[in-house]
């Protein structure tokens, strides 16, 4: 309604520190256009605030991930075709999720899991979650949560090298 638009405009003017006693601001030639400009400006401001909050959260998430899983960074093993390596950052995990079309992006928060990526010639094949309590594969998924043709071979490779994960934990 017109009244709510008027009040909304006054609130927005106050928000941006404008003089609400000035006819210049309170009585513009086209109130709707002015209202829409102020709303757009406020929305942009909120977007920037969210972006900054997300940036700060990403930095904090990276610090926490490094603290929790840093002892495993650099761990990789291969069977001459498949290379399995620890995912070493929250951003790398998010990229794994985007590329593989599955929900691994938030797994950096899983305290008792280690996330690895299996590749062939640098191309992601499957993502592996290993329990840090049992050192067993919890799940191993390819693109869109499907198993790749290398699924069993990847699990066998991880199981064969689980002692390397255990050794890193003992050394810490």
Across the structure, where does each feature detected by a protein language model lie?
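Glycine-focused motif/segment detector
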Residues: 2-172
């Amino acid at each position: 309604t017109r009244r709510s638009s008027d009040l909304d405009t006054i609130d927005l003017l106050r928000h941006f520190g404008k003089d609400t006693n000035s006819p210049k601001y309170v009585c513009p030639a086209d109130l709707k256009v002015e209202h829409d400009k102020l709303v757009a400006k406020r929305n942009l401001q909120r977007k920037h605030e969210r972006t900054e909050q997300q940036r700060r959260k990403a930095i904090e998430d990276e610090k926490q991930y490094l603290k929790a899983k840093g002892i495993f960074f650099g761990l990789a093993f291969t069977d001459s075709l498949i290379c399995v390596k620890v995912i070493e950052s929250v951003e790398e995990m998010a990229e794994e999720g985007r590329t593989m079309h599955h929900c691994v992006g938030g797994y950096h928060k899983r305290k008792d899991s280690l996330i690895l990526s299996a590749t062939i010639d640098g191309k992601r094949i499957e993502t592996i979650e290993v329990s840090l309590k049992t050192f067993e594969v919890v799940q191993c998924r390819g693109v869109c949560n499907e198993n790749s043709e290398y699924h069993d071979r990847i699990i066998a490779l991880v199981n064969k090298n689980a002692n390397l994960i255990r050794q890193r934990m003992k050394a810490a």
